Amino acid sequence: SHFMEKEIYEQPVAVANTIYGKLGEDDVLDNIFGLGSSEVFSNIKRIQFVACGTSLHAGKVGRFWFEQIAKIPCYVDFASEYRYREPLVEEGTLFVTISQSGETADTLAALRYAQEKDYLSTLSICNVPTSSLARESEHVLFTNAGPEIGVASTKAFTTQLAGLMLLAMSIAKSLEEDKDLRKNLANELRSLPEVISETLKLSEDISKIVPT
């Protein structure tokens, strides 16, 4: 669709907006998920992701990063299924929701259900500062992707991934994991908008060799 193509090309700016003000010279900055978040992260032992649709897939990608970068186990659940479980919450578990709108009914219900459990804290990655998810979570990172009209998610997904990378780096920093790796990741993340932009410039060349 027209909107989908438009939003694909908005990805470099969207990702730049997500990471803006979050990175220092060679590491992620402290407390970018809210006041006191770095202290909370120093007590994390595992993470529970809950989301729906595209956001769930972002969480599944993020799981690999958290295990590799922060060295902590992660679990990813459909919000619609999680809210009907009786989860055994282990000590030091951070509950993380991911949502573009921050109003996804099942994800919001899962957060409210989780608030009755003994989680270390709740955190959301979402795109809308005025959303219920943002208001009701203890910590939050706004992706600042701007409105997404296209049905197929584009910039919302890539900015969620950028937000998850920032979270993985932040937790790794609080847990004092692999400073050299964090430095490399900070440099790579800082260059990502330009890399995406250069990739999108290849679209015309690619269209010549891809059958329509």
Language-model features: locations:
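Cofactor-/ligand-binding subdomain signature composed of acidic, glycine-rich
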Residues: 1-44, 166-202
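A general structural motif
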Residues: 78-79, 198-207
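Glycine-rich phosphate-binding loops that contact phosphosugars or nucleotide phosphates
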Residues: 42-191
